[in-house]
UniProtKB/Swiss-Prot annotation:
The protein's name: Protein NirI
Higher taxonomy: Bacteria, Pseudomonadati, Pseudomonadota, Alphaproteobacteria, Rhodobacterales
Signal peptide: 1-30
One Pfam family, short name: Fer4_5
Gene Ontology molecular function, alphabetical: DNA binding; FMN binding
UniProt GO BP: positive regulation of DNA-templated transcription
Amino acid sequence: MAMPGKSSHAPSRLLLALLTLILLALPARPEPLAAPDAALAQALFGADGPVVLDRRETPVPGWGVSRDGRMLGVIGSTWEIAATTGYSGKPLDVLVAVTPQGVIAGARLVRQTEPVLSLGISEAHIAAYVDGFRGVDLSQGEGQGRALPDVISRATVSTGVIRDGILRSARVLAQAQGLGGGGIDRVGYRPATWADLLAEGAFGHALVSMADAARAFAGAKVPVEPSDAPFLDLYAGLIDPPTVGRNLLGAQDFTAAAGALQPGQALVAVLSRGLYSPRGTEWRRSGRFERIAFEQGALRIEPDDGDFVMVEKLALPDAPAFKEISLFRLNIDPLAGGIDPRRPFDLVVTATRPLAAGDEAALPIRATIRLPEAYAVAEAPAVPLWQEFWLKKIPGIAVVAAMLFVLALILFGQEALVRRPMLWRRVRLGFLATTLVVLGWGLNGQLSVVQVVAFLNALLSGFRWETFLIEPIIFLIWSAVALGLLFWGRGVFCGWLCPFGALQELANAAAQRLGVRQIAVPQALHERLWVIKYTLFVAIVALSFYSMEQALILAEVEPFKTVISMRFLRAWPFVLFALAVLAGGLFIERFYCRYLCPLGAGLAIPAKLKIFDWLRRRPQCGRECRLCETKCTVGAIDPLGRINPNECVLCLRCQVVMNDPGTCPVLKRRARSAAPTGDAP
């Protein structure tokens, strides 16, 4: 059982309260939007002269880019469109340029605060990766056309988020420009009759009788004679789907009409019979069809003679004998002020007659056009990025799962293990070597205080599980650490799953085998040095709410990225610092863990909440014997024999000492007392 004495809960409670106050006092701040300038737009589209940018808010926020009146495409922000958030919890913003044909013209990373990208990967390497999306044709399926650039191996999470943001935003921008026919199926075909097309909702219908018109034009100079005959029997619909257009017009006429369409255009058929003519005759002189308009919300488009296609007859034998058959090319590029064909819109034919009083009476006749579901193209649901990464890393996931299973066996069966010193040592060193080589250098499974900061910032700026699921190895380890904190405290990670901690312990074990003399730090100094790591943790967290960039610089006090993630492939100051820390660990076991590690300090804060307290103590500990104190891996046992849960890394060394009859002085005395003395000769 734990030794009685002065409680060490106060520092943890104070730090926890301080962090809570920081979180409550800092409201979420809206992130500023990065906007392109003309020079950047010109570079992204490869224009040979000045371009004009036009900010647009609907239907997709972005900037239209044109040159000499010709639309080059649109630029969008991945942060504004897809809310791309990096592992730092802050925006990862890329400006993406997409042509009307659905091709990515270029991309430029304009804002990021990722630790690896900021201080681990060269700007040229990042720029080359982002530029690798140039030329990707979004109209082609996955696996077709130009291959996507591979994520950067040392920054899989950050570059994976960049890739996902570019592709998602580019698809949205392309669809808004009419890619894929504005969501219209332009490929599928099956024979259909006029009755079939009406039953499917391919045409909107409006019928105004002569009697209805007579009432609407009461008082006209030339009155309308009321009757049941049609004043206007109107049908209108999108005929781009071959099932509609080819059956309606015949293969030859449909091919000719569809082939004349420009990107961002669709064909609308206006079919009518009755007294009133939707086209009229004025358009031949004015060039505009003043009687006809297409409306969607506040948007109104009046076609002109350049949009008009004359059709003499329909190919459907069961269609009514229409008096007028007209086709109009309709702008369906919402970014260029067009109709969105995926939403209902109206064909409005306005009939007018002069009144005897001198004014003019108007009768608007509406036929609502809807694209039937049968003719809509549903975008294939993209596999979420995090699922893609999990599928790719199944072998690594299996390795981590196996390690966690073995660790669970060790911790749940620790009483049996600690009674076998040689077995414990082999298991301990073997597991640490696996943690370093396989989990650390092999799978890049090193946790960092940056991830804690990212989590806290995400709670304030909009938490998304997808961001943290992108890296399955890190997610699994953090899940295990969370459970470990609940059951046993920080030692699950610090003592067993931290690659850098494993490197320190293995290096110190080798140093001791080589006879390197160890430095015993006085207890008073030892405890005061703890202040450094707790101060660093609070400073990094607090600074991140002010400036993530500066917080990441301070977080370089962790040599994890240099040693584990980057494998010493960094600038010499980082390598020199890492080597200095490791050198200190040769003389003081786990020197960095004891005094400098901000992540360990952060994990120590909730250590008092653990459920299990399976580390045994005896009344003699600290009073009659201090062997466990001198052998403790991180100096977590004080002179009174108490184990400080904030510092303990759960290495089980003290339990091995306590249960070894050949090592523990208490057990030795008991053995001597129990030994038979024999009779004197």
